[in-house]
Amino acid sequence: MAVFRSGLLVLTTPLASLAPRLASILTSAARLVNHTLYVHLQPGMSLEGPAQPQSSPVQATFEVLDFITHLYAGADVHRHLDVRILLTNIRTKSTFLPPLPTSVQNLAHPPEVVLTDFQTLDGSQYNPVKQQLVRYATSCYSCCPRLASVLLYSDYGIGEVPVEPLDVPLPSTIRPASPVAGSPKQPVRGYYRGAVGGTFDRLHNAHKVLLSVACILAQEQLVVGVADKDLLKSKLLPELLQPYTERVEHLSEFLVDIKPSLTFDVIPLLDPYGPAGSDPSLEFLVVSEETYRGGMAINRFRLENDLEELALYQIQLLKDLRHTENEEDKVSSSSFRQRMLGNLLRPPYERPELPTCLYVIGLTGISGSGKSSIAQRLKGLGAFVIDSDHLGHRAYAPGGPAYQPVVEAFGTDILHKDGIINRKVLGSRVFGNKKQLKILTDIMWPIIAKLAREEMDRAVAEGKRVCVIDAAVLLEAGWQNLVHEVWTAVIPETEAVRRIVERDGLSEAAAQSRLQSQMSGQQLVEQSHVVLSTLWEPHITQRQVEKAWALLQKRIPKTHQALD
């Protein structure tokens, strides 16, 4: 059957009966849709009979909220799918509810196919039912012309995937601080204005649960705080975080898709309290298990400032059924960023001027990042490694190409008695002096680049197809012109300082000063094709490097494999 880029799944079975079938329905839908899957809940609706079915309100109960949570949890095993549960017809217990929309709702990705769990008695793709389904879908949402329709049956499944059924006792996935949630059928209260906050990096299904609950509770406006600047410093692999504007763009599209009747105020979150700590018009705050204490702190802060407490709604974390050894066991952006390590982040450079049978990697990183250990791991996998520090030593040596120009520029007092350049004395001359440093680098960098080209020729002569240039100043020196890809090793600055102090015997202040004189990890990553990290145990670093190497072999053009 054809695969569609976007689809709409209309669920008509009562939620309690739907639970045992949820996994197979999602699996079937994932076979037919390869990008965006919208989900519309209309329990109890029939697609048989002459009357055209109409969208009707669904009471927001704790059972509905739990179902939304478990649907997103079940969808997490289908990582190619961007699932979005539409909330326009899900209504809280409130006296100020706006009427259901009378016009169709526009969607960011108009569905190309409409799917349903509704089943005919004979288990066929009965045309009148499919026609009713298409009419219903197009009366509610903007869909593509010539909308296809499919009734999902068990024979569409490709095997069950783990998902918690709803017909077994489970703790509520959302619980207000007061009152405590009662039965699953208990209606959920609505509020005028509320808030939710987070980093929202690479919007995932746990984010979607948090945001969906907040959207259901809010009837007029939702304030969404998006962490930025200082609040990002403690994040794992912050260099791989999406830029603030990109996170806001994806977040805003999702919010408008699922509940366009709300007014969304998406703002940067620059401190732990944000507007939730000071806005008197806010009534509720949605938090996760991890941020519940932060919500309590916000309420204490509000009381200290003569503001009413917010109603806190706590969401359970979603379990990540596919997490690996060094990843969190919950669905998290941190794990997503870890999985990016070793992947190609942007297209390689085209370098027709380089040897056609050699593919060149430029490996860089801040001091203490472990890039040289990564270079040795790549060497063990078959790469030819060029150490730019070693080339610098060769260039400085008496008779080397940089020796005479450096002595002429800085004087003979930088020499040892035996005529060798005293690099410590030379370093003291240029450190902190931009003019003197530029004089030195203008001499050294072109010479090292020339020596690197000679080493690349040697790699070709030895029959190597991959060459790695290990260089801390790769980008500052402009040596990216010598490579097809830039690979960067990243490490938290605190860990880099610890390693420098331990390795080089420097004080913490001296180590920090060294790092401040270099390009930051963030600046390096912005120009990198592949990112690696030595933050974890050595065998995890090895696994990363092997992954990066294996992916590299798949994308190296055949011309670079000619000597194999």
Swiss-Prot record:
It catalyses: (R)-4'-phosphopantetheine + ATP + H(+) = 3'-dephospho-CoA + diphosphate; 3'-dephospho-CoA + ATP = ADP + CoA + H(+). The modification Phosphoserine is found at S178, S183. GO terms for molecular function: ATP binding; dephospho-CoA kinase activity; pantetheine-phosphate adenylyltransferase activity. One of its GO terms (cellular component) is mitochondrion. GO terms for biological process: coenzyme A biosynthetic process. Residues 180-358 are annotated as: Phosphopantetheine adenylyltransferase. Residues 360-563 form the DPCK domain. Changing A214V: In NBIA6; uncertain significance. It comes from the Eukaryota. Keywords: ATP-binding, Coenzyme A biosynthesis, Cytoplasm, Disease variant, Kinase, Mitochondrion, Multifunctional enzyme, Neurodegeneration, Nucleotide-binding, Nucleotidyltransferase, Phosphoprotein, Transferase. Its main location: cytoplasm. Disulfide bonds: none annotated. PROSITE patterns: DPCK. InterPro entries: Cyt_trans-like, Depp_CoAkinase, P-loop_NTPase, Rossmann-like_a/b/a_fold. ATP binds at G365, I366, S367, G368, S369, G370, K371, S372. It is found in: Cytoplasm; Mitochondrion matrix. Pathway: Cofactor biosynthesis; coenzyme A biosynthesis; CoA from (R)-pantothenate: step 4/5; Cofactor biosynthesis; coenzyme A biosynthesis; CoA from (R)-pantothenate: step 5/5. It is linked to Neurodegeneration with brain iron accumulation 6: A neurodegenerative disorder associated with iron accumulation in the brain, primarily in the basal ganglia. It is characterized by progressive motor and cognitive dysfunction beginning in childhood or young adulthood. Patients show extrapyramidal motor signs, such as spasticity, dystonia, and parkinsonism. Pontocerebellar hypoplasia 12: A form of pontocerebellar hypoplasia, a disorder characterized by structural defects of the pons and cerebellum, evident upon brain imaging. PCH12 is an autosomal recessive form characterized by onset in utero and death in infancy. Brain imaging shows microcephaly, cerebellar hypoplasia, micrognathia, and multiple contractures. Monomer. NCBIfam families: dephospho-CoA kinase (TIGR00152). Bifunctional enzyme that catalyzes the fourth and fifth sequential steps of CoA biosynthetic pathway. The fourth reaction is catalyzed by the phosphopantetheine adenylyltransferase, coded by the coaD domain; the fifth reaction is catalyzed by the dephospho-CoA kinase, coded by the coaE domain. May act as a point of CoA biosynthesis regulation. In the central section; belongs to the eukaryotic CoaD family. This is Bifunctional coenzyme A synthase.
